[in-house]
Regions:
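Short beta->alpha junction loops
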Residues: 18-20, 128-131, 158
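Alpha-helix-loop-beta-strand connector modules within alpha/beta enzyme cores
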Residues: 45, 49-70, 107-132, 162-189
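Catalytic cores of alpha/beta
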Residues: 73-87, 133-144, 166-168, 173-181, ...
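Conserved N-terminal beta1-alpha1 strand-loop-helix module at the mouth
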Residues: 1-88, 135, 140, 144-146
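Alpha/beta catalytic cores of nucleotide-metabolism and tRNA/nucleoside-modifying enzymes
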Residues: 1-28, 169, 173-180, 188-219
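Glycine-rich phosphate-binding active-site loops on the catalytic face of alpha/beta enzymes
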Residues: 15, 64-69, 88-102, 147-164, ...
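Structural preference for beta-strand elements that scaffold enzyme active sites
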Residues: 9-11, 39-42, 59-65, 91-94, ...
Length: 219
């Protein structure tokens, strides 16, 4: 039996981003979030109002995904969208930066982009797909973010292989255990979740949260 001595309702983040959800499906997800007392949600800008209305009497951190999944947001629009998220009640920003600036050697441009996201004062989590970055670029991303005071990192974007235990060890070695590390992508089973937590990961994000919590109930 896996060790489930974790606050799973706080450490498993519900991801609700499917643009094809029916209203009935969206409401059902909200009911499940309340049923399992899930305290952290990642969602798109378009769903912020709906969450605010459906979860009006429920306490949860709602993080808005910006520039996800294509990192195609021009820098000139960052402030407007981040402020929009803040005005709509987002408690944090999960941001996918433009990595090509680093491969061009434009470290200052990359840093300026991250600083622009931070201007709102909301907690910022930087999304990184380790498997798609050259090692030098990957290390540059981490170093710049840490220098700018970023303390929250998400590894995996749902497009690529699942993070391995070797990846986790490498990430922790670079980032350190004092920062918050969330893993996303391919997480469907309770055992995956527990293994990641046992290896030092802070939290996981998944759209399969209902199935995972159903496993917990069986145990």
């Amino acid at each position: 039996m896996p060790n489930i001595e974790y606050e799973l309702n706080e450490k498993i983040h519900a991801i609700i981003i499917n643009p094809y959800l029916t209203w009935e499906d969206f409401c059902a997800n909200c009911d499940l979030i309340k049923k399992y007392n899930i305290k952290n949600i990642s969602t798109s800008l378009n769903y912020l109002d709906d969450f605010k209305n459906r979860l009006s009497n429920y306490s949860a951190n709602i993080n808005a995904l910006i520039s996800y999944p294509l990192a195609d947001l021009p820098v000139t629009f960052i402030e407007e969208l981040v402020n929009f998220a803040k005005d709509k009640g987002a408690n944090g920003i999960e941001y996918l930066p433009n990595f090509i600036n680093l491969s061009k050697g434009n470290l200052e441009t990359f840093a300026a982009e991250i600083e622009q996201v931070k201007l709102s004062g909301l907690p910022v989590s930087i999304i990184i797909n380790k498997s798609k970055l050259q090692k030098e670029v990957f290390i540059n991303v981490i170093e710049i973010c840490l220098e700018l005071g970023i303390k929250n990192f998400q590894f995996g974007d749902g497009f690529g292989p699942t993070i391995t235990s070797n990846d986790v060890r490498e990430i922790l070695k670079i980032i350190g255990s004092q920062n918050q590390i969330k893993v996303v992508g391919g997480i469907k089973k309770l055992k995956q979740v527990i293994d990641l937590f046992d290896n030092g990961i802070s939290s996981v994000g998944t759209s399969n949260f209902c199935e995972i919590f159903q496993e917990v109930k069986v145990i």
